[in-house]
Curated annotation (Swiss-Prot):
Keywords: Cell inner membrane, Cell membrane, Membrane, Transmembrane, Transmembrane helix. The keyword Lipoprotein does not apply. This is UPF0761 membrane protein Cpha266_1653. It comes from Chlorobium phaeobacteroides (strain DSM 266 / SMG 266 / 2430). The chain crosses the membrane at residues 77-97, 133-153, 173-193, 214-234, 244-264, 277-297. Belongs to the UPF0761 family. The lineage of its organism: Bacteria, Pseudomonadati, Chlorobiota, Chlorobiia, Chlorobiales. InterPro entries: UPF0761_bac, Virul_fac_BrkB. It is a multi-pass membrane protein. Its main location: membrane.
Length: 449
């Protein structure tokens, strides 16, 4: 239903709009929806889905998921042996887990590194055995490598949630240390419990075949739980329970599909073995870890978008360039200062600035400045001013802003919204121009903003 904005006629007409305009229209409608509407109708649900996926894809590209997955895959490959060494070392402290080491290896290799054969097991066992003779300083170094991987995961996920304020050192170290030390114990405990249930319930009694099939879903269930805890606990921001559930289900399904595809690829298209020979296990392992991180970050982006795109009325109004001119000047001033110091600001650096400016609004302002040609991107993913701010006036800025004086030169409106006659409109524009001849450099240097 579209009460208050045109009814059925508007529903038919809006389908004929260009894609970008259509998405903007849908987003605006979703934010203007009555806040008392707790549920979406069928048509509203269809509209929400049509808006959600472009919104998800835009954030997916903006957050550079594929690039982040590659970075995490490389660091994971370097941290794999230290992480497994630390995990097994902690498990060896508890005698009850001593018999589970072999089972843990089988579980990890079968469910998380499929299709790589026994070669990987032999290499990992050889590397891990060598770490047992490492001196104390080397053990500390292994812990540092493992902690750095956990820290990188934490920072990457929080960037997706647009949380750029770093955790306090004590808080971050406590969190990472808890994950590293208690994580293996919890994994071992779950394996003990699973083994107990297997031997006492699933290996005897009626319906043995059905029980065996149900047990085959255990890896999928473990994946759902792991993804849920990751999306629920790691972001330094409140995440709704059901959003984390939906994201963990999506990630678990993609994870199972990627496992099947990877096994099929390795068994039917042995490209790595032909090219790399005995060293093929390294690129195969890297490729698989890369796929895993793409799945993990895709699920995280999905959870973030579920929490960001709301069908109910938005608390914050959409950004109005004309009313937000002071915020535009603030961002322009940051970019100009960075350019003068020789360190162009990136989007991440702009969002980290200590000012009451929402990350989404800062992104909208940068996009607006780019579209207006006021700033441009640099080779190192930063931004720089495109024109001489000593020659560009405040009026010039207003004419380039969407909805500003240059939006429609043939129409000038009064305070009541009525279109003024052309002659009066030109006089009004000329008067405003003469009053706004101050250069932008002067505005920014005097810190009028």
């Amino acid at each position: 239903m579209f009460e208050g904005i045109g009814g059925e006629t508007l529903w038919r007409k809006e389908k004929q709009r260009p894609v970008k305009e259509l998405i903007d229209f849908h987003m605006d409608w979703l934010h203007k929806k009555n806040e008392h509407d707790e549920w979406l109708s069928d048509r509203d649900g269809e509209l929400y889905i049509r808006v959600f996926f472009p919104f998800f894809w835009k954030n997916f590209i903006h957050d550079k998921i594929f690039l982040s997955a590659g970075s995490l895959a490389f660091q994971s490959l370097l941290s794999l042996v230290p992480l497994l060494s630390v995990t097994l070392s902690i498990l060896r402290v508890f005698p009850v887990f001593e018999s589970l080491n072999r089972y843990l290896e089988d579980y990890v290799l079968q469910n998380f590194i499929p299709g790589t054969g026994t070669m990987l097991r032999e290499y990992l066992n050889a590397f891990i055995d060598k770490t047992s003779s490492v001196p104390l300083l080397g053990v500390v170094f292994l812990f540092i490598i493992a902690l750095s991987l956990i820290s990188t995961i934490d920072h990457t996920l929080n960037e997706i949630w647009e949380v750029y304020a770093p955790r306090k050192i004590v808080q971050g170290f406590t969190l990472y240390w808890t994950v590293l030390t208690l994580g293996p114990v919890l994994i071992g405990s779950s394996l003990v419990a699973s083994s107990f249930v297997w031997y006492t319930v699933f290996t005897e009694g009626p319906l043995l075949e059905l029980k065996t099939r149900l047990l085959s879903f255990l890896p999928f269930l473990n994946s759902v739980i792991a993804f849920f805890l990751l999306y629920m606990l790691v972001p330094n921001r409140r995440v709704r329970f059901y959003h984390a559930v939906y994201g963990s289900l999506l990630a678990a399904v993609l994870f199972e599909l990627s496992k099947k595809w990877f096994v099929f690829y390795v068994s039917h298209f042995a490209t790595f073995e032909y090219i790399y020979g005995a060293l093929s296990v390294i690129p195969m392992l890297f490729f698989w870890i890369y796929l895993e991180w793409v799945v993990v970050l895709t699920g995280a982006e999905f959870v973030f978008c579920l929490g960001s795109l709301k069908p109910k009325k938005s608390i914050s109004e959409p950004f109005d360039p004309m009313r937000g001119i002071d915020e535009i000047l603030v961002v322009l001033g940051w970019i100009w200062e960075g350019q003068k110091t020789g360190t162009p600001l990136s989007m991440k650096s702009i969002m980290k600035k200590k000012r009451a400016l929402q990350p989404s609004r800062a992104r909208s302002i940068v996009d607006l400045l780019l579209q207006a040609g006021i700033v441009h991107g640099t080779a190192n993913a930063g931004f720089a001013v495109s024109s001489d701010l000593y020659e560009t006036t405040l009026f010039d800025l207003y004419t380039k802003i969407p909805g500003g004086f240059g939006a429609n030169e043939s129409e000038t409106r009064g305070n009541g919204g009525a279109i003024l006659p052309e002659s009066i409109g030109h006089n009004v524009t000329a008067g405003i121009k003469s009053a706004m001849t101050i250069p932008l450099a002067t505005v920014l240097q005097d810190k009028i903003y």
